[in-house]
Amino acid sequence: MIVLFVEPIRFFDTTLRDGEQTPGVSLTPAGKLEIATHLADVGVHVIEAGSAAASVGERESIRAIADAGLAAECCTYVRALPGDIDLAADAGADSVHLVVPVSDLHIAKKLRKTREQVSEMAWSAVEYAKERGLVVELSGEDASRADQDFLAEVFREGVERGADRLCFCDTVGLLTPERAAAIIPPLLFAPLSIHCHDDLGFGLATTVAALRAGATCAHVTVNGLGERAGNTSLEELVMALEVLYGVDTGIATEELYPLSTHVARLTGVPLATNKPIVGEMAFTHESGIHAHGVMRDASTYEPLQPERVGRRRRIVLGKHSGSAAVEAALHDMGYAPSAAQLKEIVDRIKRLGDAGMRITDADIMAIADTVMEIEFTPCIELRQFTIVSGSNAIPTASVTMLVRGEEITGAAVGTGPVDAAIRALQRSVADVGSVRLDEYSVDAITGGTDALVDVSVKLSKDGKTVTSRGARTDIIMASVEAVIAGMNRLLREEHEDRSQDSD
């Protein structure tokens, strides 16, 4: 058995095909081109742009990606049918991912054919695709449950007929790492890819095991998107190879987080907060012991530097926070409390945490201002707010605010009243800089139709990030309150930074 990786390892990204099969996800041709361009910039080798046989829109997407001049190979999914192959070639694809069911379950139940019929279909399709001038990756669907001698026969003859690459598809996530180590080596008739699903949580580990066993390419999706529990995650695999095995993947790792958030925004599938590498909590620390350790030496509680994947470390404060973490956070905010003031601030933060409150940056500032008796004049004050929305009306918001003493009125439309309100606020402060809404969440604190809602937002400006919240019975006003609190924090920090620079 091969025990070292066969380098360089290639990455075949199927976010635009298998990832788009995530329930509820549907990308436009323009959105697909955006993601494909970002993938190519990050350094993936092959982009599966979709299935040319699926729709006119899919063919438009494939054509646009093929014509974009990207460094990555443009591939399309095809069945073992001449019509599928013609559509792929006519759309301008460089290669085809020729998928053929190889388990008896799929052959008999899905296709209602015999092994002999399926294998001949596969080989004939390989020959036809080569006649059309395409690179061919012959893929065994449900290979984990296939008779391995039959799979080897399909692959061996497929290569004889012209297949350039092979792919072992663990279609429902049943392949284990130890089994992958045993069954991959006998299938290396040509460069072999591994395609894993994460139904039982083994996708990443099995992909690594297959690569160690001689596979040279991994099929992945951004954020682990895919049917059911998803596919092996690009960002997790890249960093596992780099950090744990010292492999130079050739991927621009500092772009992994921007790519992840880009895909999350376009697909509408939010990132799990505790997702490795790209989740909100991946580089966030609250516990006093952990936070203190990280502040002294980040490697005490982090496996890699967050900057390596385009992230920043966050120390958040709550009931588990110790004095050192609170003092460091206050220092970053421009506060220098005395020992007695620090103790009081820590006690108040812990009381809020014990009450079940999520503590935002704006909360901490308010506590510090109160304890240290600092008079704070907000940079932004709301004077008037109007929202128009209805079944036949485009949601429109207008807002009048005092921004650093100047009265400014702004208006905007949105997909809904909350969206319109936030856009109006952003437009009103445009003269003092672009404030971006990175995250928005809402919870009902009480029950009933008059429920008190708690809106939390994360805003950023010029590389700085802040969290804030608002609580009202009116979700729109709670959102406005949260955004204004965050904007005030950002503008206040900016003012203090400039004051320090002038000193």
Curated annotation (Swiss-Prot):
Source species, domain of life: Archaea
Organismal lineage: Archaea, Methanobacteriati, Methanobacteriota, Stenosarchaea group, Methanomicrobia
Residue intervals of the Pyruvate carboxyltransferase domain: 9-257
Any GO molecular function: (R)-citramalate synthase activity
InterPro entries per record: 2-isopropylmalate_synth_dimer, AIPM/Hcit_synth_CS, Aldolase_TIM, Citramalate_synthase_CimA, LEU1_arch, LeuA/HCS_post-cat, LeuA_allosteric_dom_sf, PYR_CT
Documented EC number(s): 2.3.3.21
UniProt name for this protein: Putative (R)-citramalate synthase CimA
PROSITE patterns per UniProt: AIPM_HOMOCIT_SYNTH_1 (PS00815), AIPM_HOMOCIT_SYNTH_2 (PS00816), PYR_CT (PS50991)
